[in-house]
UniProtKB/Swiss-Prot annotation:
PANTHER family: TR-TYPE G DOMAIN-CONTAINING PROTEIN, TRANSLATION INITIATION FACTOR IF-2-RELATED. Belongs to the TRAFAC class translation factor GTPase superfamily. Classic translation factor GTPase family. IF-2 subfamily. This is Translation initiation factor IF-2. InterPro entries: DNA-bd_dom_put_sf (IPR009061), EF-G-like_DII (IPR053905), IF2_assoc_dom_bac (IPR013575), IF2_II (IPR044145), IF2_N (IPR006847), P-loop_NTPase (IPR027417), Small_GTP-bd (IPR005225), T_Tr_GTP-bd_dom (IPR000795). CDD domains: IF2_eIF5B, IF2_mtIF2_II, mtIF2_IVc. Residues 137-173 have a biased composition (Low complexity). One of the essential components for the initiation of protein synthesis. Protects formylmethionyl-tRNA from spontaneous hydrolysis and promotes its binding to the 30S ribosomal subunits. Also involved in the hydrolysis of GTP during the formation of the 70S ribosomal complex. Residues 350-357 are annotated as: G1. PROSITE patterns: G_TR_2, IF2. NCBIfam families: IF-2, small_GTP.
């Protein structure tokens, strides 16, 4: 055995000799000098001591890591292969005895806590049941032996009679002993069995379980499941005290239908509706199919349809409006400042040709009516006039029946309505409609009886006719001023303005000029050189050039402003009508105009309104199609006149759309496949070509590209400047599409007096013509007692053996009916003809 000295060992491990000797003494070795020898066994003893002093682990490693790698080949298209390497890694950790003991103690404490809680609950339950049983049964005492076998609660009653307070815990303890399974006496041995440490605990507990089984259990108060079992613990089991917890992460199936609160906006898709109801979209689609409405998962439903589906499926519906963005916009537009009086906005309304524009002409000292096509107003005109009594803003509305929507907008944007009634015509349909619009808008009326210089003017008749519709003059005790005027000579115009301004004073009209501008669109059009142009009536605040404005679903910066005379201006205050340039599209007449601080907010609101309008429109259109799908089934297909309509202003386009869509019947209809504001372009001509439509231009013309396509393809393109003409032409076209009806005209009636036989013609009826004229080779009917028994053709007509082409009334003749020989005396032969008659709408 090779030995080294202490000094050599110190040099080898690079440590001082004195320190090495000290460590050897601590290890229990006898070395004291540097020249003493050290054997291998002494080295091992020293090494073991040093490891234990540094708390190193002398046992086997506690953590084992296993790595596994598999390689496979995956073939793809093109005869290529890809190598796939899968690596798996598993780590096994051996716990120390201290950790195992700590976990065992923790589990034991948890189990004891659960047992104590369950024991306490069982005692309370047994006590409660014993008290209930005591109240139900009579208080008479019975023999103790019988009580123990027959009823488990009787001993409690007997003891309670002797000492009611002291004996109370006894029945609870008995009930607990009867109800609970027996717990093992040695939890440590049971714990070893649970960890699989050996079979000693199993063998020790076996006699104990046998003794438990041998004992006859006392009758239970009521069968029940203990809290220990429901929490996953079992008493007296096969050595394993703890089971897996049941329903720890399981899904509890609902015992009844789940009613959810479904929030539905103006539109919602089938998928979103299914998510809110926590059902599959297929169930909603299936349900809608049962209702007769085919749908898809991305189908947009309108609010009414979605509400019907959700309520039918048993859910609670809350209708919401997606107006958070609009509400924030309205909040940002609030402005407080000093208010001043503003000029009244006056709308002139009345029947067509009653002199509305002529009256305004006299007030403005202008000649607008002469420039109107056909002498009728077809746009809303906005003007402000400086009078001796103050400024007044006038809105001139059309009186034709097609412009109902325009008149309704004029009434909404106004403060006072001047109702013009012609003294010679009286109250007409559009007069009544104007009264209804004014009442709906809550606007006061001033009646101007025009054309009083004409003969036949009857003011009392007009007062009487208007009083029927709720407009009573001040002379008759009402509150509506009646002023007699003549727009031609100017009679009564000053009195009319005075009445208007008096009404304005009563209304106390106020505005805040320092606020951001706010108003309403009166009219809009597309100018080829300047782009979209909107006529705006400023209602509050001040609109300035360069402001960022939001108009309906359009927005833009005001590049220029023009007054009603076309002169550029920098700003416009309350009650001033202006034309603004710079919007990204032509807004609808009646849209509200607001000045915003930044472009981002304007764009956000405009895009939101566009998307909302599109969704609502699609949902309603789809709902309408589905509602009519079964009604139209089996009916003959309607003939359709397709029209591409272009107009100079948005209001006229809307009026024409309404008028044209109202034409037609069950067989023919008008469909406006395209339309817009501005001239007829090449795209409009291509649309008309693709949809087989007629091009109509109302106060607009076609550009060179559109004219070229029209000439090459032979399209029908027409220009109009009066709304009467376009409606009449469309009516004629629809009438031509209706075709013609076949009508029967009775030419004559002959009565059979006698019947003769002819070898050539068979039975010949000798007749007297009693009505009209009988013609040869015309269709006839044979009537017997006024009932048609045969329809055929008149083959032979003779008079005194001579052939005749016709026989008039009061004359006798012989008639041979083709292919019919059953003619009898007293029959009537009716001769008629078929005539084609053109149909009309």
């Amino acid at each position: 055995m090779t030995q080294v000295t202490v000094k050599q060992l110190a040099d080898e491990v690079k440590t001082p000799v004195e320190r090495l000797l000290q460590q050897m003494r601590e290890a229990g070795l006898p070395h004291t000098a540097a020249d003493e020898g050290v054997s291998d066994s002494e080295k091992q003893s020293l090494l073991t001591h040093l490891k234990s002093s540094h708390k190193a682990k002398v046992e086997e490693p506690r953590k084992i890591t296993l790595q596994r790698k598999t390689t496979s080949t995956l073939r793809v298209a093109g005869s290529k292969s890809i190598s796939v390497e899968v690596r798996k890694k598993k780590v096994f950790v051996q716990r120390s005895p201290e950790e195992i003991e700590a976990e065992r103690k923790r589990e034991l404490e948890e189990r004891r806590a659960v047992e104590n809680a369950a024991r306490q609950k069982a005692e309370e339950e047994a006590k409660r049941r014993a008290e209930e049983e005591a109240r139900r049964q009579p208080a008479a005492a019975q023999p103790a032996g019988t009580e123990a076998v027959a009823a488990p609660v009787a001993p409690v009653e007997a003891v309670r009679e002797a000492a009611p307070v002291a004996a109370a815990p006894a029945p609870a303890a008995d009930a607990r002993k009867r109800d609970e399974p027996r717990r093992p006496d040695k939890p440590r041995a049971d714990d070893n069995n649970r960890r699989g440490g050996g079979g000693d605990g199993e063998r020790k507990n076996a006699p104990h379980r046998a003794s438990v089984k041998e004992k006859a259990p006392a009758p239970r108060v009521a069968p029940r499941t203990t809290d220990e079992e429901s929490d996953g613990f079992r008493r007296g089991g096969r050595g394993k005290a703890k089971l897996k917890k049941r329903n720890a992460h399981g899904f509890q199936s609902p015992t009844g239908p789940v009613v959810r609160d479904v929030q539905i906006g103006e539109t919602i898709t089938v998928g979103d509706l299914a998510n809110q109801m926590s059902v599959k979209a297929a169930e909603i689609i299936k349900f809608m199919f049962k209702l007769g409405t085919p749908a898809t998962i991305n189908q947009v439903l309108d609010q009414e349809t979605a509400q019907l589906v959700a309520e039918e499926l048993g859910h609670k519906v809350t209708l919401v409006s997606d107006t958070a963005l609009e509400d924030s916009l309205a909040e940002s537009l609030k402005f407080e400042g000093e208010t001043f009086s503003r000029a009244p906005v006056v709308t002139v309304m009345g029947h067509v040709d009653h002199g509305k524009t002529s009256l305004l002409d006299y007030i403005r000292r202008a000649k607008v009516a002469a420039g109107e096509a056909g002498g009728i107003t077809q746009h809303i005109g906005a003007y402000h006039v400086e009078t001796e009594r103050g400024m007044v803003t006038f809105l001139d509305t059309p009186g034709h029946a097609a412009f109902t929507a325009m008149r309704a907008r004029g009434a909404k944007a106004t403060d006072i309505v001047i109702l013009v009634v012609a003294a010679d015509d009286g109250v007409m349909p559009q007069t009544i409609e104007a009264v209804q619009h004014a009442k709906a808008a809550g606007v006061p009326l001033v009646v101007a009886v025009n054309k009083i210089d004409k003969p036949g003017a009857d003011l009392d008749r007009i007062r009487s006719e208007l009083s029927v519709h709720g407009v009573t003059s001040e002379e008759w005790g009402g509150d509506t001023p009646f002023v007699s005027v003549s727009a031609k000579v100017g009679t009564g115009v000053d009195e009319l303005l005075e009445a208007v301004l008096l009404q304005a004073e009563v209304l106390e009209l106020k505005a805040t000029p320092s606020a951001p501008g706010r108003g309403v669109v009166v009219e809009s059009r597309l100018d080829k050189g300047r782009g979209p142009v909107a006529t705006v009536l400023v209602q509050d605040g001040t609109l300035r050039q360069g402001d960022m404005v939001l108009v309906g679903s359009n927005y833009g910066r005001v590049r220029a402003m023009l007054d009603e005379n076309g002169k550029p201006i920098k700003e416009a205050g309350p009650s001033i009508p202006v034309e603004i340039l710079g919007l990204d599209g032509t807004p609808d007449a009646g849209d509200e105009m607001s000045v915003l601080s930044d472009e981002k907010k304007a764009r956000e609101v405009a895009l939101f309104r566009q998307g909302k309008f599109r969704e609502v429109k699609l949902a309603r259109a789809h709902a309408g199609k589905l509602e009519n799908i079964f009604e139209n089934m089996g009916q003959a297909e309607k003939k359709t006149l397709n029209i591409v309509l272009k107009s100079d202003v948005r209001g006229s386009l809307e009026a024409l759309n309404g008028a044209l869509n109202g034409l037609g019947n069950d067989e023919v209809q008008v469909r406006v496949v395209g339309g817009g504001v501005g001239g007829i372009t090449e795209s409009d001509a291509n649309l008309a070509l693709a949809s087989n439509a007629v091009l109509f231009g109302f106060n607009v013309r076609a550009d060179a590209g559109a004219r070229k396509i029209v000439e090459q393809e032979g399209l029908d393109m027409r220009y109009y400047n009066v709304i009467y003409d376009i409606i009449e032409d469309v009516k004629k076209a629809l009438t031509g599409m209706l075709g013609s009806d076949v009508r029967e005209n009775i030419l004559g009636v002959a009565e059979v007096r006698d019947v003769f036989r002819s070898p050539k013609f068979g039975a010949i009826a000798g007749c007297m013509v009693i009505e009209g004229t009988v013609y040869r080779n015309r269709p006839i009917r044979v009537l017997r007692e006024d009932i048609v028994i045969f329809e055929g053709e008149l083959e032979s007509l003779r008079r005194f053996k001579d052939d005749a082409s016709e026989v008039r009334a009061g004359m006798e003749c012989g008639i041979g009916v083709k292919s019919y020989n059953d003619v009898k005396a007293g029959d009537k032969i009716e001769v008629y003809e078929k005539v084609q008659v053109a149909r009309s709408l």
